[in-house]
Structure formats: C-alpha cells, structure tokens
C-alpha cells in the first residue's frame, strides 16, 4: 500500500470526508465516536486511522491510480487528494461538457470545475469506497440473472416441463416417419391394412401430442405465474422502502411507467417465447435425423441459421433505440396525464383546457409516431425472417427434386425431410419474430432495474430504542438536498425540551420544513447530529422513530377508505374507543357523527368527499391516535378557513398536553402562544424567544413579519 498520500494533520478533513462518504452509502456514523476511537493523538485522522475507521464501518476500500481519461468509468463518489494535502471528493463527471463536480471539504461546498481546473488538483491517486450492502446489492442486481434463482426454486416444475417437451419432440419426430411409410410403402404396394394401422397409430400420437402440449402450457404458465407474483410483490415492497429522495427526484408518471413495465415481463413469461426456446434446444435431435436422410439438404438448413442470427443482430440495436424512444414518450404522457388529473381543479378554474389539450395532442402524436416507427421496424424484421425462410424452402425444393430424380432420395424421404425441417425452423422463426418481445422485455427489465436496483432505506444494524420521551437536539446541522444544490441549513443549533411547544416561523425557503424532515430521518445531515433523548437518529431505525412521531402537513392525503380506516391506518385492529378519542381531541367527532355512515363513511379518493377542514381534522386525529410523544404541525392550518382553524386551535392545549410539539406556520397567530418561537432566515436561526419578547426587537425579522400581517 502506498504511504505517500498526504492527509492534513491540522484540520481534520479526513473525518469530514469519511462522514460524507459513509452517509452517501447509507452507513450510519457517529463522528465523535470515530474521533474517540481512531484520533488518539488529537491531530486528526491520518491515512492508517482513516482506513481503520472506514473498515470499522464495514466500508470496502480500494486505493488506485487512474488517468484522467479513465475517471468516467469508475464508481463515484471517490476520495482524491490535492498537492496541498487537503481532501477532495469527486462526486460526478459530465462527459458531454467535460466538467467535474467536486466537494471541497475546506470550503464545505460543491464546485464545478473545467477539465483544466480539475487536472491541476488531480494527481491520479484516489480511494474508491463502497459499502458491503452496496456490494450485496450489486450481486443481487435485477437483470435477466434475477430469474435464475426463481428457476432453481421451481426446478421440479421446470424439469416436468422439459420431460413433457421431450415427449412432444419424440411425437413430432414420429409423425413424419409415418408419412414416409405411407408414401414409400403403402401407396406403392397398395397396403390398406398397413394404412389402417398407421392411421390408428397416428391418431393416438396426435391425441397424446395435444394432451401433452396443453399440459406443458398449463405447467409452464403455473410456474411463471408464481414468478410473476414474487416479482410483483418484491417490486411493490421495494418501491415503498425507497427513500423519499427517490420520489422527489423523479416524476410520478415516470415511476408509474416503470412499474407498468411489469406487464411486459408478465406477457413474456406467460407467452410462447420460452417454450420456443425449449423446442429449439431439441432441434439437435432433428438435425441428426435430417443428416441421415440428406446431408446436402441439411447443410442448406444449417447455413440459413447464421442468416437468421445476422438479421436479428442487424435489427436489434435499431429496434432497441426506437423502443427506448417509445418508452420515453410514454413516460412523458404518463407524467402529463397524472399531473393533469391531479390538477383538474386548477385547469378548470383557469379555463386552460385548450392549452392542456394542445400539449396532450403534441405529446400523443410524438408517442404514436415513436410507436409507429417501432411497428414498421418490427414488420421489416419479421418480413426479413420470412424472406430467409421462403428462400430456404425454394432452395430445398429445387435441390430435393434433383435428388429424387437422380434416385438419391425417395419422394417419401423428401416429404419427411421437409416436415422435419419445419419442426426445426418453426421455433427459430418464432424466436426471430418474437425478437421484438425479447428486446422489449430487456428494456422493461432495465426500466424496472431503476426501481429495484435503487438502494432502500437501510434498517439493518439500526437501533430500535425504547419509547421516546421527547427531548430534541439539533447540533451544528448543515444540510443540502443534493451535492450540487445550495445549502438549506447551515450550522443550526437548537434544543427542545420534553413537553415544550415550539413555533418555527420565517420566510419561504428558510429551512423550516427541512428541520422536521431531518427529525423524521427522511434525510441525514451533511454535517452535525439530530438527537432524540440523546440518541443519534443516524444510528436509529427509521420505522421505530416514525411510529412515535405524529405529523400533520398542509396537504394531507387520505386513502379511499372509511374515516375509521384512515384514522386507524397504522393499526387496523385498533379499538373504536381509541379512534373516537383521537377524533374528539382533533375536533372531528361532531361532524363525523352527523354523516349518514358516521365513521364508516368512505372519504373518496384523496379525501375528495370531505371539505378541507374536515380532511385536516381527520389527519390530526390520525396523527394523535398512537399517542405520539413528538407532534409536528407543518403549515397544518394555513389553508383552513377561520372556523376550522378556530376549532383546531381550541383543542390545541389538549393536543399538546404531555407532548413535544413543533408548529411551523406562516400565520404568527398560530404560534404566538408557543413556549418558544424560533425565527429562521436563509438556513440560520436568527431569533428565538416568546411572542412578546420578540416584538420588543423592532429591528428583528419577527417584528417585521408581525407588522406585515397586522397591516
């Protein structure tokens, strides 16, 4: 191992780099603990200590020397070092613009460098780093190999399918032989008794062939249906386990389009393509028999096979590009459709139906055009296969007739050979014609792989602690949503005592909601710690945490179920008494009781059957029903009418009793009775105190906001 890699001994950039890289790989790390264990002399992590610390976190490392031309092919992020010994993390490379996104640990900011600028700081040495979970994820990558364990799991059924296929091929081999006997023996010698025997035998063979063919289809469909169920269940579980950042970085329609690719895989598994592969594997037996009849005619058949393969190889890349384009256009349509249906109130209110229709027509035309190009190319591919097949048939007819005339082959043998060649060519032709399906399912697996190969929230090795009490601490929090995004929170320090009611106010974009997202462990801060009862949330099980936090947002989603089911969503077996108690606490019981079906009333999709105030009160009841020790109101009343807000505020004292409550609001009247009010501006806490105390500072932001709202 090289030893000349410089690590700055005065400023501990090594620890900071380790924390960032570990968090990127969803590995929880406590910086203070790492420093305590490995920074024994207090001078910062040197190279050996850094490697030992990374190993203790089960991170896999590899020190390499790379030329700048090879960098686009390595797995990022990676740690590189500069001439002055200060660490730099290479985050991303844009090969089109030849620019490099780095994270400067000294300035704690991302930078975009040109190739020349990056070349000045890059000496060729770097540390590639990944986690064991990432390695296991790569080994379990979803692609065609995913189906191998499934085949092994159902190997008994597939063995039965192969056995049935063997018998079917034997029957397919016997039938042409019967025809040869009829042509060369029965017709020549006028053997009616032999004809009767052959007819009965052929009838028996046909019956068995039909029964076995149906049995094979049933067995195969049964096994593929099981695989389909496993894949569908795995897909949905994995989708819900993905971190919230996955969904925030993708359009809803794009995700829906990827999930719908499961239909393509389902059609492929239950179709005739795989049985055609089995039939093709048994073609070697037919080739042996055909060679026995006529080596010359068999050579013609064999020479046609490379033509099928070459034609498929020629068509495949063009077809794949057009299928990719078709998928992209379909994803655009899905996204626009979801967006339009979700925003139908706005579309109608603004009377922009013509504009939206115009956009849809253009996108639909693009999709139809892409689909048409796929269809045309697929048709060309199929006709090319037909051309090869017909050409081989003509050559065999001409050559076979010459062999019969010369006495090298009988008429019965020629007919038998053509029937056998049909058994060989048929699965080849079917596979060639189904090549579009192979291409489509390959693209579908790639699209699904974007979902199934994305890392889920890491629960393994996380702490499931006892019931929380509600002490909260944010220590030196620094956070941004993406490495190249602006800083949202910068060196935020905040302590909240158990049972304290905190109000957080500030301008839009000041970082108020981001604080609560960190508290729910939707994200891990770039720097600093979020603590509950002294426990670092980076080390905690997210499910354990979220079960003990109640959250009410400005736009809460209700499922298309009964009111009771929505309130008791986390525990369907919950007693009715608990549901009613939570509803009373949220001020929802009275209006629920006035409904014809009461708590059994179906709320409609997204709660469309209720008013905004009613939906909000049900959402509050849902947040309270588990008696959470921490309660978050994130603009929970900003969109309500004054009557609905008044009902909720009347019950606020009961709601907050015995809990730690964080209220984020733009209306200062919502938080003026809080124990403490936090004022945020551009990712910093600029003021804090009680309502009256903050009003005393006429130069403060809180006073300014209060004056605006008062006026």
UniProtKB/Swiss-Prot annotation:
Any idea where the ABC transmembrane type-1 domain is? 158-440
Peptidase C39 domain: from which residue to which, for each copy?
A: 1-129
Active site location: 87
Q: Does the keyword Transport apply?
A: yes
Show the stretches that span the lipid bilayer.
162-182, 195-215, 273-293, 299-319, 392-412
InterPro entries on file: AAA+_ATPase (IPR003593), ABC1_TM_dom (IPR011527), ABC1_TM_sf (IPR036640), ABC_transporter-like_ATP-bd (IPR003439), ABC_transporter-like_CS (IPR017871), ATPase_T1SS_HlyB (IPR010132), P-loop_NTPase (IPR027417), Peptidase_C39 (IPR005074)
A GO biological process of this protein is: protein secretion by the type I secretion system
Q: What are the recorded GO MF terms, alphabetically? A: ABC-type transporter activity; ATP binding; ATP hydrolysis activity; ATPase-coupled lipid transmembrane transporter activity; peptidase activity
Write the record's keywords in alphabetical order, separated by commas.
Answer: ATP-binding, Cell membrane, Cytolysis, Membrane, Nucleotide-binding, Transmembrane, Transmembrane helix, Transport
Q: Which Gene3D superfamilies match?
A: ABC transporter type 1, transmembrane domain, Cysteine proteinases, P-loop containing nucleotide triphosphate hydrolases
What are the binding positions for ATP in this chain? 506-513
Q: Where is the ABC transporter domain?
A: 472-707
Q: What is the effect of changing residue 469 to K?
A: In serotype 8
Tell me what topology the record assigns in the membrane.
Multi-pass membrane protein
Q: Which GO terms describe its cellular component?
A: plasma membrane; type I protein secretion system complex
**In UniProt terms, what is the effect of altering residue 416 to A?**
In serotype 8
Give the signal sequence positions.
none
Q: How does it assemble?
A: Homodimer.
Q: Additional comments on file?
A: The sequence shown is that of serotype 2.
Tell me the PANTHER family matching this sequence: ATP-BINDING CASSETTE SUB-FAMILY B, BLL6336 PROTEIN
Q: What does this protein do?
A: Involved in the transport of the toxin RTX-III.
Q: Which family does it belong to?
A: Belongs to the ABC transporter superfamily. Protein-1 exporter (TC 3.A.1.109) family.
Q: What is this protein called?
A: Toxin RTX-III translocation ATP-binding protein
* Organism of derivation: Actinobacillus pleuropneumoniae (Haemophilus pleuropneumoniae)
Name the gene behind this protein: apxIIIB
């Amino acid at each position: 191992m090289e030893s000349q890699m410089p690590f700055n001994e005065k400023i501990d950039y090594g620890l900071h780099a380790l924390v960032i890289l570990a968090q990127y790989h969803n590995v929880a790390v406590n910086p203070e603990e790492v420093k305590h264990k490995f920074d024994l002399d207090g001078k910062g992590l040197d190279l050996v200590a850094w490697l030992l610390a990374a190993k203790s976190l089960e991170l896999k490392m590899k020190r390499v020397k790379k030329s700048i031309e090879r960098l686009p092919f390595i797995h990022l992020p990676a740690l590189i070092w500069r001439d002055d010994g200060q660490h730099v993390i290479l985050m991303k490379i844009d090969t089109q613009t030849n620019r490099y996104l780095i994270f400067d640990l000294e300035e704690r900011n991302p930078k975009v460098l040109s190739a020349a600028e990056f070349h000045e700081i890059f000496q060729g040495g770097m540390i590639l780093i990944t986690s064991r979970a990432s390695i296991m994820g790569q080994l379990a990558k979803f692609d065609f190999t995913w189906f191998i364990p499934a085949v092994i799991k159902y190997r008994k059924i597939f063995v039965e399918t192969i056995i049935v296929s063997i018998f079917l091929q034997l029957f397919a081999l016997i039938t042409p032989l019967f025809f040869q006997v009829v042509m060369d023996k029965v017709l020549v010698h006028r053997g009616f008794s032999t004809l009767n025997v052959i007819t009965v035998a052929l009838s028996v063979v046909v019956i068995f062939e039909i029964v076995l063919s149906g049995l094979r289809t049933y067995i195969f469909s049964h096994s593929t249906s099981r695989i389909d169920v496993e894949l569908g269940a795995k897909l949905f579980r994995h989708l819900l386990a993905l971190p919230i950042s996955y969904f925030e970085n993708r359009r809803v329609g794009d995700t829906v389009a990827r999930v719908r690719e499961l239909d393509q895989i389902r059609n492929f598994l239950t179709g005739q393509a795989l049985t055609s592969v089995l039939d093709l594997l048994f073609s070697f037996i037919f080739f042996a028999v055909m060679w026995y009849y006529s080596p010359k005619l068999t050579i013609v058949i064999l020479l046609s096979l490379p033509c099928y393969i070459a034609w498929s190889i020629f068509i495949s890349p063009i077809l794949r590009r057009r299928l990719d384009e078709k998928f992209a256009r379909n994803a655009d349509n899905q996204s626009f459709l979801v967006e339009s249906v979700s925003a139908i109130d706005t579309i109608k209110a603004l009377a922009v139906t013509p504009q939206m229709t115009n956009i849809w027509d253009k996108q639909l035309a693009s999709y139809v055009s892409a689909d048409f190009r796929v269809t045309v190319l697929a048709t060309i591919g199929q006709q090319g296969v037909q051309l090869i097949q017909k050409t081989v048939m003509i050559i065999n007819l001409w050559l076979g007739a010459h062999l019969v005339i010369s006495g090298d082959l009988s008429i019965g043998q020629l007919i038998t050979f053509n029937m056998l060649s049909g058994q060989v060519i048929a699965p080849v032709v079917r596979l060639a014609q189904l090549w579009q399906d192979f291409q489509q399912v390959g693209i579908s697996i790639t699209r699904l792989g974007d979902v199934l190969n994305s890392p889920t929230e890491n629960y393994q090795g996380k702490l499931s602690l006892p019931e929380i009490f509600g002490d909260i601490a944010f220590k030196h929090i620094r956070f941004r949503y993406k490495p190249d995004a602006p800083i949202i929170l910068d060196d935020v320090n905040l302590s909240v005592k158990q049972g304290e009611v905190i109000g957080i106010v500030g301008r839009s974009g000041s970082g108020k909601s981001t604080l609560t997202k960190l508290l729910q462990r939707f994200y891990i801060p770039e720097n600093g710690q979020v603590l509950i009862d002294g426990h670092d949330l980076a080390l905690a099980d997210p499910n354990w945490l979220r079960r003990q936090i109640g959250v009410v947002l400005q736009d809460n989603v209700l499922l298309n179920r009964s009111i009771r089911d929505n309130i008791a969503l986390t525990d369907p077996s919950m007693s009715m008494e608990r549901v009613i108690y939570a509803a009373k606490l949220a001020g929802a019981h009275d209006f629920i009781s006035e409904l014809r079906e009461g708590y059994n009333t179906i709320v409609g999709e997204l709660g469309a059957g209720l008013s905004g105030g009613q939906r909000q009160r049900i959402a509050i009841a849902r947040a309270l029903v588990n008696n959470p020790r921490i309660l978050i109101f994130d603009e929970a009343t900003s969109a309500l009418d004054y009557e609905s807000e008044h009902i909720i505020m009347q019950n606020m004292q009961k709601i907050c009793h015995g809990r730690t409550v964080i209220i984020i609001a733009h209306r200062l009247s919502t938080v003026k009775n809080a124990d403490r009010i936090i004022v945020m501006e551009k990712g910093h806490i600029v003021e804090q105190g009680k309502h009256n105390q903050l009003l005393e500072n006429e130069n403060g932001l809180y006073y300014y906001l209060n004056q605006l709202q008062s006026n």
